[in-house]
Each structure stands twice: as structure tokens, then as C-alpha cells.
Amino acid sequence: MQKLKQQVFEANMDLPRYGLVTFTWGNVSAIDRERGLVVIKPSGVAYETMKADDMVVVDMSGKVVEGEYRPSSDTATHLELYRRYPSLGGIVHTHSTHATAWAQAGLAIPALGTTHADYFFGDIPCTRGLSEEEVQGEYELNTGKVIIETLGNAEPLHTPGIVVYQHGPFAWGKDAHDAVHNAVVMEEVAKMAWIARSINPQLNHIDSYLMNKHFMRKHGPNAYYGQK
């Protein structure tokens, strides 16, 4: 697990590097599907002092199998998403400013241009609010459940992120670094959407044919963006 712990450590260290976290407001995890184990950031440990060996390994029930620290308080959310979506290899949660602002406003991040369409096939959805019973019960598990409820049967890698109402963004990807990449993009397109709608409140969504072109040229079966 040492290699995966190093990858998760590096991905967590990317969060402050890209300006996605303040203090300890974020976490990254990755899963080893063959072993059924997840590596995740320890709860409340400062990035300045964190080391790869500080990463915590848990099984799919959340039991710590390796590590000296308690795992992230959001571990149950990560595990619920891994259980539901086999295509996920890494998950990120942050409170990045602009994506969190959309979450607090209770609004999906609208797909307004090609930057958005290069990564997200449609709006980045916002979940419903959790009930008092859901919050007082298994809060983190129920956060995962409301994300799944919102995504439905959609392919999660086609919309690799969501904003949880009154909470903040979660993003995911094929591995931890891919998930961080998508979290960075989500924050940028959230900022772009806010600015664009401030300039033109009547701004329409991106045309569907342009959305399809930009997403499919990067992610479709005949994708041709980048190098092989």
C-alpha cells in the first residue's frame, strides 16, 4: 500500500498548491479495488507537517487497518461513493471558494462554455438539502447517499463532480490525481460561471452541439484531443 499512500499524500498536497483548501478544509482518497482498501488523509492534520506515512488505510466498512491517526471525518462519504461506482479510483472534497458558493446558493454550476464542456457533460448538479434526521443520524454516510440520489444512473466520470447543498464540492476521477485535476477545473468553471452570469444575468447555457463536440473529442470513443 506504500505506493498508493504516496500517491494520496501527493494528491492531498496538491490541494493547497492549487488554492483549493484553507487550513485543513479538504481531503483526498484513493482505492485499491483488488484489496478492498482505501487510503485517505488523516483528520485535522496540517498540510505543513503531513507525511506519506500519515495517510490512513481503511477497509470498506471504515475500519482502520493501517495508520496512527483517525481517518478523515468524511471517510464514510468516500466509501459510499466507492461502493456505488466501480469506475471511481479517487475522490476529493474541498471547500474551495467559488464551488462552495454555488453549493451554499443551492444551485447547479451551469455549463456556459467550452472550458466546462471539456470536463463536465452538462451542469454540475447540486444535491438537495439533508433533513434534520439525516444530519443527526449517519451524517457523512447520508451525504454520500444524497450524492448518489442526485447522480442517479449517470456515468460519474462524465460529470466528475457535484456540489452538496450548503456544504461544498466533491470531485472524483480514475485515480487521486485525476480527481484533484477535476476539483481544480470545477473551482475554475464555478468562478467563470459566477463572473459570466454577473456580466449577463440572462446568459444561456452552452449550445448542446458545442457541448457534445468538446466533451466527446476528449472523452468519447473516437477522442482525438492530446497525444496517444
From Swiss-Prot:
A biological-process GO annotation: L-ascorbic acid catabolic process
HAMAP family named in the record: UlaF
Reaction catalysed by this enzyme: L-ribulose 5-phosphate = D-xylulose 5-phosphate
Protein name: L-ribulose-5-phosphate 4-epimerase UlaF
Pfam families in the cross-refs: Aldolase_II (PF00596)
Note accompanying the cofactor annotation: Binds 1 zinc ion per subunit.
EC number: 5.1.3.4
SUPFAM superfamilies: AraD/HMP-PK domain-like
Top EC class, one word: isomerase
Residues the entry annotates as binding substrate: 26-27, 43-44, 72-73
Source organism (scientific name): Shigella flexneri
Family named by the database record: Belongs to the aldolase class II family. AraD/FucA subfamily.
Originating gene: ulaF
Function: Catalyzes the isomerization of L-ribulose 5-phosphate to D-xylulose 5-phosphate. Is involved in the anaerobic L-ascorbate utilization.
UniProt xrefs under PANTHER family: FUCULOSE PHOSPHATE ALDOLASE (PTHR22789), L-RIBULOSE-5-PHOSPHATE 4-EPIMERASE ULAF (PTHR22789:SF9)
Residue positions of the active site: 118 (proton donor/acceptor), 225 (proton donor/acceptor)
Keywords carried by this UniProt record: Carbohydrate metabolism, Isomerase, Metal-binding, Zinc
GO molecular function, a single term: aldehyde-lyase activity
